[in-house]
Amino acid sequence: MNSFPNDDLVYEILLRLPAKSVARCSCVSKLRRSILSRQDFTELFLTKSSARPRLLFGVKRANGEGLFFSSTQPRNSYEKSSLVVAADFHTKFSEVISREICSYASGLIYLSDMRISVNDEDVVRAICNPITGNYLGFDPIDKQFKVLFMAYPSGPDDHKILTLGTRRMRWRKIHCPLTHDPFCEGICINGVLYYLAIQIDEPLVNQRSFVIVCFDVRFEKFTFIDVDCFYHLINYKGKLGGIDWKHGNANGSRTFELSMWVLEDVEKHEWSKYDCTFLEYEVMFYNISLAVGMTATCEIVLSEKFASKSFYVFYFNPERETLQRVEIQGLENHCRVYTITDHVEDLNVNYKRKHKMALVRRFLAAKKIIGGSVAKLRKETSAILYLNRYWSYPASTTLINYKGKVGVINLTHAYERVFPLQLRMTVLEDFEKQEWSTYVYTLMAENIVVKYVSVVGMTATGDIVLVKTNACKPFYVFYFNPGRNTLLSVEIQGVGEDHKCLNFHTVCAFVDHVEDLQFSFKN
């Protein structure tokens, strides 16, 4: 008599577990591994995980080690102004050499210049699932992942693209008509990858203009949009959006002005703009604050760059004009923190052996692989958006998916790098006309002193997520909802310890992370 429960009961039990626990179950027996690798189960798990997206943190230690944590995202950030949550540890990598730890797409992390094992001599580029710790894989047909390699300052035909999941993965050359230098990670909205870049005019090298590069992945074509200065791109209700911010002064009081642009018409390039101003006394920051993204609930998220004793993330709702503070506990102290909003745990990628393959080994090391280089894409055409104004702080700019439109977020902070923060979001309303809308908000957080805050993205619910970029305790994540104009601060516990002698450990955070069970391996 077979005592093993039927598949329906096994599914019901496993669907209640996090992806890491499910991945461990696959090691129990071949029978359970076969059940967990079935497409119907992995799709069910992904659907359930998508309904509960998380905040993903990538922490980079001073010794080069990379760690991944995640925490829950508040569902109703406007109900409370301050929260404290604990972070869950997932996996650790031996050495991440690159300055920027990773880029993110659909539950997968791209890591450049890393050593998978402490005994590895070769430095590789790899794609992994941060929940299971497994590397490299593919989705079924019509759910392809691709890696876009943009070479600079080489010629326009030196760019390459790689499709994951094919039997013979190889780099193919791809033509881009515009010589440009990508300077921030990209965002994928409805099969189009958007990223910010500086256009390089060959006859006049010292002259610069700024563009949003639009890459249609199905047709592998580029188009371009001229835009103003953004600090961060977001997905605002399926539209491309951009966020910018600056500090000001009103009646003798220092203010934080946040602007958000939304691309209302892609063809005409028409944008709408939203502005919001906050008073400085509501938030106190002695650190760099950056908009890191927007949640699926349309909240702009502000985060610190480095983890310290107190790590905060702020959620600002532009519609309600509310600001919520979240203290993140558990991140390591003195670490660089990268924050990603709306992370969805996904186990959708299968490969035969764990830690066996790296995507690229020392491939054109002097050139750039753009942020957002791993994308879940179905179409392959592209366009370019131009940014004509000079961007004083391009590193503070983030692309977002704002309600299905490409958006850009810019975060401005005071000289002392404290709250209030001014967040400017620009959304591409009309792609053809390159018309943008702009929204400006000032973010305030009460009685919180945090350093090194950055925008990591926008959640599927429309919250812009900001996090500390180091893992010093306490660790905070901030959810800003442009619609409500609210900022929620969430303290994440469990990410790190107090290490007085260590240098800053960096943290990378990802929004709307979905656990996926299909990224597993066979022995």
Curated annotation (Swiss-Prot):
<feature type="domain" description="F-box">
    <location>
        <begin position="4"/>
        <end position="44"/>
    </location>
</feature>
<dbReference type="Pfam" id="PF00646">
    <property type="entry name" value="F-box"/>
</dbReference>
<dbReference type="InterPro" id="IPR013187">
    <property type="entry name" value="F-box-assoc_dom_typ3"/>
</dbReference>
<dbReference type="InterPro" id="IPR036047">
    <property type="entry name" value="F-box-like_dom_sf"/>
</dbReference>
<dbReference type="InterPro" id="IPR001810">
    <property type="entry name" value="F-box_dom"/>
</dbReference>
<dbReference type="Pfam" id="PF08268">
    <property type="entry name" value="FBA_3"/>
</dbReference>
<protein>
    <recommendedName>
        <fullName>Putative F-box protein At1g30925</fullName>
    </recommendedName>
</protein>
<dbReference type="InterPro" id="IPR017451">
    <property type="entry name" value="F-box-assoc_interact_dom"/>
</dbReference>
